[in-house]
Amino acid sequence: DELDEINMGGPTRTLVFDLSELDNPQLHHVYNGVTRAIDHNGYIKDEFYYLANYTGGLRVINVNEIGNERMGEIGFFDTYPSDDKANFAGAWSVYPFFESGIIAINDINSGLFLVKAKNMEN
């Protein structure tokens, strides 16, 4: 799903599949983000999806209602503020699993960012 923003235009798109039957995966939901940046590595921790969004930086998406096909961005940290174009610059990966709540963002251009959310409510 990494090249759809370049080849087809449009916003960041995340495809959510129901894998309850491994022999018969079903497309459950399509989430369209708020930028045209390319989505890359994403990780779920609790009810949040932490997404490296290249030029869009880190995006934090609430997936608490994913079963009802509802996902919504609740925060972001832009490591590449000059633009949100669909190209391979900015945040390549994130790591939200530190017990301290710190989130590591690996940025291709600017190196390592360590951030911590003030409030993780909806």
Positions of PLM-derived features:
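Feature marking well-ordered beta-strand scaffolds used for ligand recognition
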Residues: 1-122
